[in-house]
């Protein structure tokens, strides 16, 4: 492959840095929205308004999904322009082709990444810090790092790109299980 040649070896590193920067911007928005719910969740949990907590969680998931879908549409619809924003307008054809592929593959599950962050922070706000920390560590360390190390020997550079979307999908399923289990312990009767 072309990236095995010395003059092109820096391309994957530069591209992954750009992709990670865009990912961090989107995730920062997702974290900000979820963090804004923390005092509201804490108050309503303390006051016994579990119905409100469930409604807020549904609203938050909808907002996070919207941010994720909007980001995905930008990545899928305008990859060249997105790459140019990060100062890569005069690069080689190999750079541009790889950057477009990297954006589309690495960020194909950004909707789930946003939802996962919301679930982690919401669990923390509900007083379930252990579950929140466990899910976060599973996503970042077990799935994120683990898949980034396991997939490349079998899939090469594509293994690195697919590691995060696969981690997001696996973490999403784990989050669904933990949230479902947590909901069982919330009282069905609402005080207000």
What is the predicted role of each segment?
Residues 1-18, 25, 43, 83-91, ...:
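Helix-terminus/linker motif at the lipid-water interface of multi-pass membrane proteins
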Residues 3, 37, 78-82, 147:
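Hydrophobic/aromatic end-of-helix segments at the C-terminal termini of transmembrane alpha-helices
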Residues 7-8, 65-66, 113-115, 125-126, ...:
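Short hydrophobic/aromatic segments of transmembrane alpha-helices and their interfaces
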Residues 15-73, 77-79, 113-135:
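Small-residue-rich hydrophobic transmembrane alpha-helices
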Residues 17, 23-26, 96-104, 139:
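Alpha-helical membrane-interface segments at transmembrane helix boundaries
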Residues 31-34, 106-125, 131-140, 147, ...:
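Short runs within selected transmembrane alpha-helices of multi-pass transporters and secretion channels
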Residues 41-108, 151-192:
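Short alpha-helical transmembrane segments in multi-pass integral membrane proteins
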Residues 85, 142-144:
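Alpha-helical transmembrane segments of compact multi-pass small-molecule transporters, enriched
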């Amino acid at each position: 492959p072309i990236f095995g040649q010395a003059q092109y070896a820096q391309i994957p590193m530069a591209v992954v840095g750009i992709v990670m920067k865009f990912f961090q911007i989107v995730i920062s928005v997702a974290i900000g929205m979820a963090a804004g719910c923390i005092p509201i969740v804490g108050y309503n949990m303390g006051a016994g308004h579990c119905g409100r907590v469930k409604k807020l969680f549904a609203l938050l998931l909808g907002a996070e999904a919207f941010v994720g879908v909007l980001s995905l549409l930008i990545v899928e619809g305008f990859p060249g322009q997105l790459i140019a924003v990060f100062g890569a307008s005069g690069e080689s054809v190999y750079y541009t082709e790889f950057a477009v592929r990297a954006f589309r593959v690495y960020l194909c599950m950004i909707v789930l990444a946003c939802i996962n962050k919301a679930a982690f922070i919401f669990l923390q706000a509900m007083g379930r810090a252990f579950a929140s920390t466990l899910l976060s560590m599973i996503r970042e360390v077990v799935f994120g790092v683990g898949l980034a190390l396991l997939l490349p020997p079998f899939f090469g550079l594509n293994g690195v790109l697919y590691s995060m979307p696969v981690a997001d999908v696996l973490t999403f399923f784990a989050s669904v299980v933990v949230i479902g289990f947590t909901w069982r312990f919330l009282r069905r009767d609402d005080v207000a």
